[in-house]
UniProtKB/Swiss-Prot annotation:
Protein's job: Binds 16S rRNA, required for the assembly of 30S particles and may also be responsible for determining the conformation of the 16S rRNA at the A site.
Biological process per Gene Ontology, one example term: translation
Protein name: Small ribosomal subunit protein uS14
Pfam families documented for this protein: Ribosomal_S14
SUPFAM superfamilies: Glucocorticoid receptor-like (DNA-binding domain)
Subunit structure: Part of the 30S ribosomal subunit. Contacts proteins S3 and S10.
InterPro entries xref list: Ribosomal_uS14 (IPR001209), Ribosomal_uS14_bac/plastid (IPR023036), Ribosomal_uS14_CS (IPR018271)
GO molecular-function terms, A-Z: rRNA binding; structural constituent of ribosome
Stretches that traverse the bilayer: none
Organism annotation: Pelagibacter ubique (strain HTCC1062)
One GO CC annotation: small ribosomal subunit
Keywords: Ribonucleoprotein, Ribosomal protein, RNA-binding, rRNA-binding
Entry similarity comment: Belongs to the universal ribosomal protein uS14 family.
Length: 101
């Protein structure tokens, strides 16, 4: 199990990035638009840099929903490889069987 503080910190980052996503996207669009004057683009860049660091989407870690493990997480299932194996061995995932050859 991961530390509760690490999981809570990640959840806080997720909420913050979701809340400021549209604002961040709008500012990025202004910064990347070559038709807008250099002065306005610079102001938008400063506003973008004044946003909280944790509001960036790449600061969010994909964590296992069961254990909180940060590595080896299947994106589609949001479960780590270890938790997936345990659930599969206990027969809790339909269609998943232990392989034998």
């Amino acid at each position: 199990m991961a530390k509760v503080s690490a999981v809570n910190k990640n959840n806080k980052r997720i909420k913050l990035s979701d809340r400021l996503f549209k604002k961040r996207q709008a500012l990025k669009k202004i910064v990347m638009d070559k038709k807008i004057s250099l002065e306005e683009r610079f102001k938008a860049q400063q506003k973008l840099s004044n946003l909280p660091r944790n509001s960036a989407k790449n600061r969010v870690m994909n964590r296992c929903q069961i254990t909180g493990r940060p590595h080896g997480v299947y994106r589609k299932l949001k479960i780590s490889r270890i938790a997936l194996r345990d659930l599969g061995l206990h027969g809790l995932i339909p269609g998943m069987t232990k392989s034998s050859w």
